[in-house]
Amino acid sequence: MSVPATNLVTINVDGRDYQVPVGMNLIDALELFGLEIPHYCYHPKLTVAGNCRMCLVETGMPMKDRQTNQIIIEPDGRMKIGWGPKPAVACTTNCTPGLHVRTNTQVVKDCREGVMEFLLINHPLDCPICDQAGECKLQEFATDYGRGYSRFVEEKNVKPKRTLLGPRVMLDDERCILCSRCVRFCDEIVKDPVLGFIDRGSYSTLTCYPGRELDNNYSLNTVDICPVGALTSTDFRFKMRVWFLKPAPSICTESSVGVNTEVWSREGKIYRVTPRDNNAVNDCWMSDSGRELYKSVESPLRIDFFAVDNGKCAADKALARATELLKGGSVGYIGSAQSSLEEQFLLWLLVKTEAGPVSFVNHPGKGDGLLISNDATPNLRGAFLTGLLKELPKTNIDDLRRKVESGAIKTLFVVHEDLAALGFSDDLLRRTQVIYLGTHANLTSDYAQVVLPGLTVFEKTGSFVNQQWRVQRFFQVVPGPAGTAPDIQVLGQLLARVSGNTSTAPTPEAIWQQLVASLAPLSGWSWESIGMQGRVLDASAWVHVPFPEGKSKHFDPAAVTAVKAG
Amino acid sequence: MNLSAKTTQYIDNLLPRYPQKQSAMLMVLHAIQEDQGFLSKEAIEWTAQKLEVGPMAVYEVVTFYPMFRQAPIGRRHVKVCRTLSCALRGAYKVCDSLQHELGCGLGETSADGNYTIEFVECVAACGSAPVVMVDDKLHENITPEKAPDFAAKIKKETTPLLPPSRH
Amino acid sequence: MPVSERRIIYRHIDEPGYTLDLACYQRHGGYEVLRKAIQRKPEELVQEVKDSGLKGRGGAGFPTGVKWGFLDRKSGKPVYLICNADESEPGTYKDRQIIYKDPHQLIEGTVLSAYAIQAKLAFIYIRGEMFGGFKILEQAIEEARAANFVGNNILGSGYSVDIIVHRGAGCYICGEETGLIESLEGKRAYPRIKPPYFPAVLGLYQCPTIVNNVETLCQVKHVLDMGGKEFAKIGVAGDSGTHIWGISGHVTKPGYYEIESGKATVRDLLYDFGGGPPVGRTIKAIIPGGVSMKILRMGEKFKVKLPDGSPAEWAVLDIPLDSNSFAQCGTSLGTSGMIFMDDTTDMVEALANLNAFYAHESCGQCTPCREGSLWLKKITARVCSGGGRMEDIDLIKNIADQVAGRTICAHGEAVAWPCQSNVPKFRDEWEGKIRAQIHAREHPDGATDHARTGLRLV
């Protein structure tokens, strides 16, 4: 995150001047420059608690002459600084002009060593069995700022261990440092005040009201923000040490909110999904239901083969048969709002080459006003942008089905949808020539003449357009099953064969060169220019479309009427 | 919730006096505890509804403040101050003596259900140390020498016919 | 010449025939100050309090007029006055006498102060253990309301204020002003971080709030009665008025004595008022102001500056009873509850007693106090039960140093100061005791209980 250019003031930290936004929290301000003030309880998205006392630093302000109200200047030209008699917590300090901070004095070192020692005296020796190891703030700060040895020889406090706080969250009270981040999160972000501290003093214990659980759909965020291993994910428990995991940036496909995610994998297997920071979309949160979606990658229903007439075959044969069917005319298309923008673009090129009616299916979601919207697909707007859609899709495809029944349409190119669920009878399904591109088997793929394997969002690279008309990129985390290829390659090859144009564009960057040239709102863009926080496009062309989403965090449908290009 | 009409009336009169309902928390809990002898789970949830807060907010408070208890105690609540001024004048000896005389362990309820003996922290009567509170009354100058007589007095007052302690 | 009390606040405490009812209070001139003051401008009353130099009597000794001046008047939010009647500092019992024996003085002081700061509503937060006091105060308020001294349109002035008596439930930390505010809001008594939650700006319900001790509010009545400048003449410069000294511990006549600030010494308090130590014993140590203040060892000498600037040296008994004098001796007057310990006292056990208190009362919000207080308790308990090590002596002091000044509220200092003063000043006792314990552990045959000398304190 770079320093915003407006309203800067000068503060001095350890003898050096820094320009920071006025009023900004000191911890956040120093992070802009890569300077760390160690802290536990402070979190930029929650109210300030100030209880861990790890962020104690020395602060001072220039002293003013009582009579003249002028700043006193020392003989060497520097301002005379009145340092506070006690260290102050940085988390309640806002940057004001002239603020002086010292973080490298003996006093601050003593404070940090002291707090570290206090935090560790009742802490259990759980590192070998604690999931937090490797990303634990106690470990990190003990190494960086701790004394390195313990003086505690008394009996440690005993508290409940490994209790199920909720269906997805495990609580180990002995590890808890009582920072109250989880309590504040449930109170302030989710508005479900189910967590709290009972008892008093060093016996204070985090718990849920007896009989209730931490079961809201954002409970796993408490695991993310817990600085220690007190709150851990039951799904991830004991599965993998975090230092073996590689994170890759992705986008949650649960809904059109387009929550930014981090997907962690090792050797081709995904172990967990966590939120990725994006202050314009999801802050640093995501839903529990969104995290589960990675489990669809390893499913017995995965389509990891090419097939013609129910027989697995080489890609070449399947593509050839599909080309044949498409060239046969009377084609209808069913696109998917699960597809990436690049895939939808290639589909549009295909439609232009071999024309036919295009349908999408509306998948309504249950918006919760937070990070799940009323649209359960990540990229409906991509379909509008590419021109595949002019109006909102319905939940049925009756029009298209009638055309198939009447014989006006003989071949259907179906992406990711199940015709059986859309009212196609078994009989009709058998009679129709279907080319199916998708990730998981269903009745449609069972009956399809040609089956082309698709990849999940975790196995390919591309972009989605979310409810804010923000284009956001996702990157491949794990390779797809052996023998498969990203959808854009499959579609690209199909397009090449159908159009006779042999040149294909197998990478997102290359497709973007075409996208930018064809679609006016993307004029001047590039794949790189989207950045890692996404980029909003000019959506004035679709201002009249009554999209179904209501309010979410960082999204108000009423404000969309004046969307500017990013 | 089997609160007496008097208690319910008291709480209903009390709530509107406070600018915010949650403020009345301690007073409501005191009233319920005096009525029922302790604060049950039902009482906690009743209070939560009455004050329009989540039950966790009430539960947090009940476990924080030592005067609130979640289980019944003996008929007579004997509280011996253990902080410095009283300790300097023999509070620990007084407590031992009372435990012996009343047949009750420290922090426990006696087998006959008549007494509960606890240490408490300074009750702000240091000039007449050692002090002992029994139910809601303060008893001053209960020295180790006087402790056996004091215990006898408590026992005499606590005949089985006396209604259960309500404090 | 023996010093005598100057009973201003305590004029009628224990007076034969003085009863709690309004009629008695009025016979003795009660509510006359209110009658006159409520016709004056509130700002004038605040100025009187500023002129008086009155310092708060709750332990921190902050100038009351200055505190009132911090109130945020710009936001337009209602102002609240809270009387801190949560007297819980061990060794202190002065407010109890006022509440139980002269409640109307407190009521009048509360209404006067509420009027001066233009409070919308006043609370008296009384500790839960004072069952009787609660009833007495409620009764007194009802009497006052019936006579138009509390409630609507007081004495026809147009000013209205009600007083709600609110009971605590057994927490020392509710005596901390922001802890009290949280408790009054119906929550766990977690003190607030300052900045930004200064009560005068963001107090009760995030509105400007003043929290004053019981005795302070009573002192306000007398300030307004005689005028601020006259009040300032009582006592000494920098500490005007009287202090109510409650003495306890090893003295012949424990009790409460109202003494003009600076006009008597510790010696006077011990001998003239307290009747001296128990027969056959000598005083070894005193804690001047409630147990949170640093302990003084008899035999210590302090190099000080007298009010005229000249240097002097005081023994403990020489210290005048005013805040500046105690400050010069490295401790504090605090709540003026002096505890005397004689030569039979095991100083290690005394500290263990206090550490157990602070560990029990720590609210648990911030790391140093929460963990440090319990750790200190465990160490001193271990030493008292015979398991002491020589390194524990420095360890205790070191842990206390890690707590003081690093916490959200002053409970950190309260945890630390007894350790930081007891251990260095009585090091010989600690070393002797622990050495004996080590010896007993190494020679388990026939060794007597070397854990404790004197009375059991923990």
Regions found by a protein language model. Name each.
Chain A
Residues 26-60:
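A basic, amphipathic helix-loop patch mediating RNA/tRNA/ribosome contacts
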Residues 344, 350-526, 530:
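Non-catalytic alpha/beta scaffold blocks inside enzyme catalytic domains
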Residues 24-28, 340, 486:
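Short, structural beta-strand-to-alpha-helix junction motif
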Residues 217-275, 416-418, 425-442, 477-492:
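Phosphate/diphosphate-binding loops
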Residues 53-251, 257-261, 269:
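Fe-S ferredoxin-like electron-transfer domains
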Residues 332-343, 418-420:
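Gly/Ser/Thr-rich loops at beta-strand to alpha-helix junctions
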Residues 153, 161, 264-330, 372, ...:
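Cofactor-/ligand-binding subdomain signature composed of acidic, glycine-rich
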Residues 512-566:
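Long, low-complexity segments enriched in small/aliphatic residues
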